[in-house]
C-alpha cells in the first residue's frame, strides 16, 4: 500500500534487500523501528528470531525441507486461518540466478513434497511474527550455504537484535557515527523540512 503518511517514531519498517552480482541474486529481510522500539515489537522480533534460528540449526546434508518446516508455527498460532493464507511468511526458498528457486520450504508444501538438503545448496530462510499491539510485526531473513558438514550463514547485515534507526551502535573499533552526524548540509535541510512538515509547521525552502 502506497501513501503519503510520514514515518513516525515507533513505526516498524522492514526491507527485502535485493542485490545482483554477476547475475546471482540476494534476498534477505531486515527489520527496524523508527526512534524507539516498543516492548511488543521487541517481543515479536525475539520470537521471530527464535523461529529463524531453530530452522537454521537444522540445515545440514541429509535433512529434509519437511524437517525444517516442522519447527515453524502453524498458521493458527499466529493469526491465520490456514497455511495457504500465510504462505511465504514462514518460508524458505532456493536462491541463485533467480530470487525464488528450489528447494521450497513451507508447511504448505514441504510435508507432502519433502526435498533432501544437499551440499552446495544456497537458500534463504525467513520468518514472521505479529506483535501483540495488533498492527506491527517483525520479519527476518538469512541466506545460507549448505556445506559438507553443516551450513554457513552468508548474510552479514546484523540481525541478532531489533535495530532502531537513530540509535548509536558500537563495533570493536568504537561507536558507529549517527546518521545525523554524517549527513551533508542538503540532506540535513531536507530532513529538517520533513520533520517540520510532520509537525505541520511551515518551512521556507529558501531559508
Language model features by range: what are they?
Residues 1-207:
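Active-site neighborhoods and metal-handling regions in enzymes and metal-associated proteins
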Amino acid at each position: 500500500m502506497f501513501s503519503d503518511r510520514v514515518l513516525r517514531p515507533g513505526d516498524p519498517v522492514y526491507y527485502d534487500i535485493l542485490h545482483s552480482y554477476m547475475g546471482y541474486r540476494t534476498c534477505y529481510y531486515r527489520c527496524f523501528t523508527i526512534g524507539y522500539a516498543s516492548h511488543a515489537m521487541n517481543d515479536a522480533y525475539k520470537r521471530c528470531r527464535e523461529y529463524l534460528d531453530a530452522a537454521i540449526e537444522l540445515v545440514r546434508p541429509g535433512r529434509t525441507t519437511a524437517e525444517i518446516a516442522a519447527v515453524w508455527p502453524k498458521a493458527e498460532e499466529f493469526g491465520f486461518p490456514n497455511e495457504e493464507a500465510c504462505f511465504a511468511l514462514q518460508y524458505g526458498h532456493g536462491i541463485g540466478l533467480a530470487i525464488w528457486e528450489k528447494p521450497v520450504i513451507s508447511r504448505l508444501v514441504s510435508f507432502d513434497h519433502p526435498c533432501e538438503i544437499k551440499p552446495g545448496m544456497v537458500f534463504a530462510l525467513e520468518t514472521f511474527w505479529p506483535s501483540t499491539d495488533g498492527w506491527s510485526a517483525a520479519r527476518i531473513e538469512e541466506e545460507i550455504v549448505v556445506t559438507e558438514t553443516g551450513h554457513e550463514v552468508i548474510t552479514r547485515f546484523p540481525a541478532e537484535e531489533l535495530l532502531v534507526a537513530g540509535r548509536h551502535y558500537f563495533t570493536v573499533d568504537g561507536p558507529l557515527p549517527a546518521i545525523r552526524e554524517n549527513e551533508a548540509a542538503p540532506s540535513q535541510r531536507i530532513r529538517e523540512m520533513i520533520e517540520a512538515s510532520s509537525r505541520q509547521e511551515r518551512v521556507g525552502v529558501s531559508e
